[in-house]
């Protein structure tokens, strides 16, 4: 998405697709906000550009559209809809494949990128998927209460401090969703409640 016009067309395609499939807009907006915070916090490690951040935001808005087809396998259904739906025709083709892959990988066991993708594109898929998984887990109950207050590099891993939500009851889910991010960072990802 190098040109302003294609970015506007992509935003419009995402908005239309989100509406068409009845996506929870408040959840999508909140997950996008959390994902952008994580994107910024981990930017020294992933070194991805502005285009990747836009794809991440779009994935946050579209990650649950597969529920329109079925709850079971909604990540796969969502990826298919993004790759094939006419509403997405104006989305840049290469970024559309990346977007579809990120949505596919937001839950369950992630799929690797196609071998013919350049290394940078494969890395983008891994990082964007990992960040979306954590952001979505932080708003799993669709309450829009979690706020990332700080991300700290500490003791060979990272501590994500969360306000508005006590992460302890969700420890297993958060650890499961942070597995990809931990692999990319080379250390554990820990969640704790931010001090008030």
Predicted regions and their residues:
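Ordered, soluble secondary-structure elements with a strong preference for glycine-centered loop motifs
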Residues: 25, 69-72, 168-175
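Divalent metal-dependent catalytic cores for phosphoryl transfer on phosphate-bearing substrates
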Residues: 14-19, 27, 33-152
């Amino acid at each position: 998405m190098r040109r302003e016009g294609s970015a506007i067309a992509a935003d419009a395609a995402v908005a239309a697709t989100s509406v068409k499939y009845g996506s929870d807009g408040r959840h999508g907006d909140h997950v996008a906000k959390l994902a952008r915070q994580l994107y910024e916090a981990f930017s020294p490690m992933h070194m991805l550009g502005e285009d990747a951040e836009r794809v991440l935001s779009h994935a946050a808005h579209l990650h649950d559209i597969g529920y329109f087809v079925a709850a079971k396998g909604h990540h796969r259904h969502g990826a298919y809809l993004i790759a094939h739906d006419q509403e997405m025709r104006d989305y840049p083709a290469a970024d559309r494949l990346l977007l579809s892959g990120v949505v596919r990988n937001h839950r369950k066991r992630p799929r690797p990128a196609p071998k013919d993708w350049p290394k940078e594109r494969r890395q983008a898929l891994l990082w964007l998927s990992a960040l979306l998984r954590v952001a979505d887990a932080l708003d799993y109950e669709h309450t829009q209460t979690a706020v990332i207050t700080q991300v700290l590099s500490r003791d060979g891993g990272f501590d994500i401090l969360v306000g508005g939500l006590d992460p302890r009851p969700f420890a297993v889910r958060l650890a499961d969703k942070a597995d990809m991010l931990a692999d990319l960072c080379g250390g554990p990802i820990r969640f704790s409640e931010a001090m008030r």
